[in-house]
Amino acid sequence: MPKFLCSLLLAAGFASAVVTASATESVRKADEPHSLFERYTNAAQDVILQGLKLVGVRYRLGGNDESSGLDCSGFVRLVFKDSLGAQLPRTAAEMSEVGQRIDVSQLKPGDLVFFNTMRRTFSHVGIYLGDNHFLHAPRTGAEVRVENMEDSYWIKRYNGARRIIDGN
């Protein structure tokens, strides 16, 4: 009998610790995303939504604010700063050295995509949206817009991609 009572008390103590740990864990998880996937999704969504708010903003060479206009790297810098608080370098070429290099087959929304538009590599940058589309500030006389990476112009000029968002 004493052995049974000891086992019962031990089991009750263990069950109490498990219930307490589970309750604490569920309270902690209520305030934060439950998985790496959700954290990625939330960060990527923030980047994309911030970028889409700027569709229609005019292009200006060297531009880095919404009111006076944006160039491609100014657009990407502003989006990442406003959505994630991330400070990216000023030029597309410098951005091409940040984050993790990824293959085109591994692209996920929020990744940076790079192109050769000025007869030099990594001279243009945009934000990948998914389904082979990206968001960018294209050129003088144009506005921030969405384009298809499968258009022949972009296919010929594609230089690579970088992942900036952690956990992506």
What kind of region is each of these model predictions?
Residues A43-G51, C72, V76:
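Stable alpha-helical elements in mature extracytoplasmic
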Residues S7-A17:
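Bacterial N-terminal signal peptides
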Residues G110-L112, N132:
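Structural motif
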